[in-house]
């Protein structure tokens, strides 16, 4: 078992503190859910962990290796952002080997969810199809830890259920942190759940705590 250890994360924008003394651990074999209202800093936290944004303070390590730059994160952390990142003119089948080892490349080529997209360039895909392709490339990548920012956004119930199944399958040998406003889908598959609220990250033990912290209405 490997551990991604995130500690002492602080981040401010324009004098306003977004994240304060954040601590979170992700282990291979587990899915960690990250919940919070819009604008609380969930995406910023994932960007700091991925190395695309620098915190005012941060301490991030994978097992005994402190992660300082992008090279340190190579093959350790893969990040699915909310924005599209794949090159528009390249066919999906040609992108898969760039992200995945031989074994996972073969698995992806046989996966029903992506089969219809293999011979298409990204520019020809719908918004939903692009999200499917990008999510699968990240999930099946060589990285040990996966960060997913709004992976279910825009998906049909059928596609969401299939993506949940794949996330759970990949978590058997990877550590996954997932953030999505569709909290039911996150809670359904998460082994541990954290709530980001008022700049702090709180470990959530049961559904009632989400109500106590005013993330969910008391009537639910």
PLM regions and their residue ranges:
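ABC ATPase NBD coupling module
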Residues: 54, 64-78, 214
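Walker B catalytic motif
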Residues: 150-151
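Helix-to-loop junction immediately C-terminal to a conserved catalytic motif
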Residues: 50
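Conserved structural motif at the start of ABC-family nucleotide-binding domains
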Residues: 4, 19-21
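Conserved ABC ATPase "signature" region
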Residues: 103-120
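The feature captures the beta-strand-to-loop junction immediately N-terminal to the Walker
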Residues: 35-37
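Q-loop/switch helix immediately C-terminal to the Walker
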Residues: 79, 83, 88-104
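Conserved beta-strand-loop-alpha-helix hinge in the C-terminal portion
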Residues: 200-220
């Amino acid at each position: 078992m490997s551990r991604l250890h995130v500690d002492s994360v602080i981040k401010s924008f324009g004098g306003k503190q977004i994240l304060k003394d954040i601590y979170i651990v992700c282990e291979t074999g587990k899915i960690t859910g990250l919940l919070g209202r819009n604008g609380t800093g969930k995406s910023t936290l994932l960007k700091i962990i991925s190395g695309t944004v620098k915190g005012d303070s941060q301490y991030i390590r994978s097992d005994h290796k402190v992660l300082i730059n992008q090279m340190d994160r190579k093959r350790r952390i893969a990040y699915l952002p909310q924005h599209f990142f794949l090159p528009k003119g390249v066919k999906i089948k040609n992108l898969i080997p760039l992200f995945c080892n031989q074994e996972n490349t073969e698995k992806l080529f046989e996966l029903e969810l992506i089969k219809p997209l293999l011979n298409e360039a990204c520019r020809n895909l719908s918004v939903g199809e692009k999200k499917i392709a990008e999510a699968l490339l990240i999930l099946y990548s060589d990285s040990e830890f996966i960060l997913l920012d709004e992976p279910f956004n825009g998906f049909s119930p059928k596609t969401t259920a299939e993506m949940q199944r794949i996330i759970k399958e990949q978590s058997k040998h990877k550590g996954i942190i997932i953030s999505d406003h569709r909290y039911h889908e996150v809670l359904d598959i998460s082994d541990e759940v954290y709530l980001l609220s008022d700049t702090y990250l709180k470990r959530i033990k049961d559904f009632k705590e989400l109500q106590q912290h005013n993330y969910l209405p008391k009537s639910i």
